[in-house]
Structures are given as structure tokens and as C-alpha cells.
Amino acid sequence: MNIHEYQGKEIFRSMGVPVPEGRVAFTAEEAVEKAKELDTDVYVVKAQIHAGGRGKAGGVKIAKSLSEVEAYANELLGKQLVTHQTGPEGKEVKRLYIEEGADIKKEYYVGFVIDRATDRVTLMASEEGGTEIEEVAAKSPEKIFKETIDPVVGLAPFQARRIAFNINIPKESINKAAKFLIALYNVFIEKDCSIVEINPLVLTGEGDVLALDAKINFDDNALFRHKDILELRDLEEEDPKEIEASKYDLSYIALDGDIGCMVNGAGLAMATMDTINHFGGNPANFLDVGGGATKEKVTEAFKIILGDDNVKGIFVNIFGGIMRCDIIAEGIVAAVKEVDLTLPLVVRLEGTNVELGKQILKDSGLAIEPAATMAEGAQKIVKLVKEV
């Protein structure tokens, strides 16, 4: 689950991570009133959307008067802000964060993530702040420093100081930076985060360390013990299809292609998308129905896939391990009839009761194209979609 920058900064502030003072506003008039509450002559007007790259896209403005705050607020509110993370359609700006300006001496990047290679939380940092970390990794990987954290000990003070030293924070501010990083690590652990990222973290002219940004992603599987965080969820920032999918324990992520995918298991789903790409197609989604797919879940999965107007065909790729292929086949037949499917449909089944499942599909009389392998299924759906 994602939250807005201003919400992330409230969490930071409550856990001892220094941030500038700021207020959220939903109208231009409110933006001016909130700016009046700040003890500053320079204001930063920030568009609040669930996407990075806002600064480069014109979503962050520096105002030196209340009239400029109002002008920038009017400019940003209601605007479709297009960044490298939103796609070409962009996201509508519905709220702003009005923040005190900071005396920036130097910008840095810091982030905590889960490193799948070590199964540990890893602290990453770079002195190339204000730049996308992926860009730094591609062009100057030697400028990214990492500390792998022992879950029993936590982020040790010597590790925090070492990374501060490595990214060239001045020696007089290293202890402040170390304290900052330890507080940030505590946010990551106590709030069950999957990502905590600040870009930029800044060193001020007075030698203080501040978080000028706040990107926090939470582990959805841990939200049951964070009711306060659940209340921060902004459904308007999420894909309605993803929201609907979550109601049925379906993992759905929309993509830009035209071939709908329904698969069980995240690994098989990614392999299916790669195979479609390999044969010249473009997946329209990632959809994992999980290990306990029922007729109802399969039907809802079809409805969600068909909710994307770009979809021109569907590839169902199911391995029946825990699930029986005959049950899945019955669900597919019932779902196709209920949604009155007219698009090309290719189904590949393998596993428990696979022959019975294939017979059910064959006897249905529906226009379901069978496939013996994932590669064959991908080739068939790519060809059929191109003929539509």
C-alpha cells in the first residue's frame, strides 16, 4: 500500500525523523491559509500523487509570496500530472502539500529496501540526491553504497556512521546523519514497510539533516496490525480494477498491452508474460488467482480483465497442483458463459485431473482454444489477437 508524501512525513515526524513543517491543502484558498501558518518567506507547493518524478514533471513549485502560492495552487490542482511513473495518461492532482522552504547545501539519496538475495533489510545511500536512483545505478553504480542489516541487531550506529561517511556528509554532521538513519530504520521496521525512500535527503546550511521527500510502501500482508495506516489509503489514487481484485484475493496489476492474462502463482504469471513478449505480444495485466481459485474467483477475474478496453484476447495458464484442473475448467466455462465472452480465449491446463479438465472445455461447445504448453498458448493468443 502506498501513501502520499505528506502522510509519510507525518509518520516520520512522529518517529523522530526531521522534516520541514508543512500543511496539506485541497483548494487554492486553503493553500494560502495553510501557507500563512508556516514561519517562512519561501514556500514549496507540491502536487500530491502516488508517483515519483513530480519535480521534473512540474509538480513542485517554489513560491516567494502568498500570491505565488495561490497561483501555483490554481495551476496544479486539477492538472493531469504526467511523470515517468504515471504513464502517458498521468494522474489528476487533487491535493497539495505546502511546505517551508529549506536552505539546501547538498542533496543525498537514502532508502531502505528488502534485498531478496540476502533476505535482509538493506540501507542504500548515494551523494547523487535529487536524481532517480535507477539512473545513478545505471550510470555511476560506484556512487551507491549499501549496508546489510542484521535483523537481530538492527541498524548499528557504526553502520549508520559509515554510510554517512561514504556519501561524503561533512564530519561535523555525521552523528546527526547517523541518528537520522537509525530513526528512519525504526520507521521501516515498526510500520512493516517494504520501501522507505527519501530523495532528496538534504544537508542544510546550518548542518542539519532533513527529509525533503517521503516515499513509503507498506507490506499489504501486515496491514491487519496497522489500522491507523489503513486509514491513510487514498482509493482515488489506485486503479479501480486493482481495488476490485483485492476484494476477491486476486493479485492484479494493469499493464499497457492487449493480451489479458489469468494465471495461478506469481512466478508462473511472470513467466507467462515473458513468453507472450517473446512471441511478439504485449500483456495487458498481471493477474494471479492464487492457489485456491473457485468458480466465483475465476468469474471475477474474467470481469476484471474485460474491464480493460484495450484487451483483445485472453490467455489462461493454470498449473493444477493444489487446485484440480477439472474444477478450474468448470469455472472457466461458467465464467465465459456469464460474461458472454466474444474475445479470443486460449487455455493451457496442466497438473491434477488435467485430462478431465481438457474434456470439460472440449465438451462445453465454447470457442476455447486449447494449448498443450505455455509456449504454444502464448503463440496462439498472439496470433489470434493480431487477427482481431
UniProtKB/Swiss-Prot annotation:
UniProt function note: Succinyl-CoA synthetase functions in the citric acid cycle (TCA), coupling the hydrolysis of succinyl-CoA to the synthesis of either ATP or GTP and thus represents the only step of substrate-level phosphorylation in the TCA. The beta subunit provides nucleotide specificity of the enzyme and binds the substrate succinate, while the binding sites for coenzyme A and phosphate are found in the alpha subunit.
Gene that this sequence comes from: sucC
Binding partners and assembly: Heterotetramer of two alpha and two beta subunits.
Residues engaged in binding substrate: N264, G321, I322, M323
Pathway terms, separated by semicolons: Carbohydrate metabolism; tricarboxylic acid cycle; succinate from succinyl-CoA (ligase route): step 1/1
PANTHER family: SUCCINATE--COA LIGASE [GDP-FORMING] SUBUNIT BETA, MITOCHONDRIAL, SUCCINYL-COA SYNTHETASE BETA CHAIN
Bound cofactor: record note: Binds 1 Mg(2+) ion per subunit.
Coiled coil regions, renumbered to chain: none
Binding residue positions for Mg(2+): N199, D213
GO cellular component, one term: cytosol
Family: Belongs to the succinate/malate CoA ligase beta subunit family.
Biological processes, Gene Ontology terms: succinyl-CoA metabolic process; tricarboxylic acid cycle
Organism: Staphylococcus carnosus (strain TM300)
Catalytically driven reaction(s): succinate + ATP + CoA = succinyl-CoA + ADP + phosphate; GTP + succinate + CoA = succinyl-CoA + GDP + phosphate
Keyword list, A-Z: ATP-binding, Ligase, Magnesium, Metal-binding, Nucleotide-binding, Tricarboxylic acid cycle
Domain ATP-grasp intervals: 9-244
Top-level lineage group: Bacteria
UniProt-listed NCBIfam families: PRK00696.1, sucCoAbeta
Protein name in UniProt: Succinate--CoA ligase [ADP-forming] subunit beta
